[in-house]
Amino acid sequence: MKNILISGSLAYDSIMVFQDYFKNHILPDQIHKLSVSFFVPELKRNFGGTAGNIAYNLSLLNSNSILMATVGEDFSSYEKRLSKLDIVQDYVKEVTDSLTAQAYITTDLDDNQITAFHPGAMMESHQNSISSVTEKVDLAIIAPAGKEGMIKHAHECSEKNIPFIFDPGQGLPMFDKNELNTFIDQATFIAVNDYEAELLMKVSELSISKIQSKVEALIITKGAQGSEIYCDKKITIPSIKADSPVDPTG
């Protein structure tokens, strides 16, 4: 079975439900001095982060995942969860005097969201090195983490001829034109959603066809409209109809 190295974040997601509408508590003409507090009787703490989410889904497919991430001193409960899933954590590094990345997400009855994100130890992702991995790596995934770490790990994959998927996600705005063009030149595959694809084209100043010509495949997800894969041809993948769609946040 092939080994997939996942460089990204591990995070706690605290999901809160506000049993009302934000619009009833925010006065538009007083927005310049906003001070609000929401009573949230429902709270769930989930295990998340880009690397954690990818590793979990690969475990459902019986794939071998190797996690590479930086975490804080509060990681113990997440560590136990990953151990139960038999996910390799040899390259999960604890950063002293730091907390694991965490998001605090409040959702109202209209599914509007207010989110606060603390990156914590995630910003130290450059402390890890792909050169330290002793296992054979068949494919790597560079997912959102600290900017310096993402650049470093993509460079290491390129130097070691490890094929990798560049999955910038919400980290895309961190990079300028030159940095994104370097990622595109180094990557084997690129995976983005439709909004990120537009942003990638704008900042890199490259068209979809030009980006695709530099990689083996460009994957664009489009939510309910399915996905598109651009390789030597365009492949359209329809979405699966859900009986009861749920909010995937966290």
Show the residue positions of the predicted features.
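Conserved phosphate-binding/catalytic region of the ribokinase-like
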Residues: 4, 205-250
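Beta-strand->loop->alpha-helix junctions that form or flank phosphate-binding loops
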Residues: 68-73, 90-100, 216-222, 241
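A glycine-rich beta-to-alpha transition motif near the start of alpha/beta enzyme domains, typified by
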Residues: 40, 64-91
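Conserved beta-alpha-beta core of the PfkB/ribokinase-like small-molecule kinase fold
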Residues: 139-208, 226-227
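Hydrophobic anchor at the start of a short beta-strand
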Residues: 4, 63-66, 89, 164, ...
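Conserved phosphate-binding/catalytic loop of the ribokinase/pfkB sugar-kinase fold
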Residues: 90-95, 103-144, 148
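Glycine-rich phosphate/adenosyl-contacting loop at the front of the ribokinase-like
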Residues: 1-66, 77, 238, 242-245
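A short, aliphatic-rich alpha-helical micro-motif
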Residues: 134-135, 184, 212
